[in-house]
Amino acid sequence: TASEERENGIYEYIVEMYKKAGLYYLGRPEASKPHYFHMYVNKRIEKPEDFAGLKLGGSTAFHGQYKRLGASVATLTIPEYQSAMERGVIDGVDTSIFMGATMGLPEVTRYLIGHGFYRGTPSLPVNLDTWNRIPKDLQNMMVETMAEFEKKYYAYWVEQDKLCLKEHEEAGVEILYFPPDMEKWFIECANEGSWDYAMERFPGDVIPQLKERITK
């Protein structure tokens, strides 16, 4: 969790990474459990082989997962998700259920895979030059306030996640749950696919070092 990152040294590691880019990392404004994103699909999935032949769309950040699942990929911008699902251009798409509800995905989607993956991705950076001009006591206050916000948001998110999932069911979306072994495989495809994408985009030592620090 975001709070754990502040306790085990990962937060400081990320701060130093951001500084190299001229930024100061304050924290995660959407601190969540590791099932922030879900997959919307219009074909029932019951076994791993059912992903083969599907066309899954979304940002390039999800392509590693799609490839690990055995599906073909389509790059889409977020405003295209709803219309692409409605017109059958794609068979499925990854996004948070909050964003999915906002863009109307429940209206054009038959199924939602109930096993979520990844955490909320937004971060809160500050220009490093600006940060360095802020008095130290105010810097400390901002860091402490952000840490407290992450704890409160985490609890808030857990409740909102349950409510939003219920709203999807009430809208007629069937929630699919896999057997334990298939669930494990599905989550591994998401996690390892994400690292595949990161390594491809940022070759070198940074990603392996980050993976070693933040994975359990």
Per-range role (PLM):
Residues 1-9:
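Extracytoplasmic "Venus flytrap"/periplasmic binding protein-like
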Residues 1, 16-216:
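N-terminal secretory/targeting leader peptides
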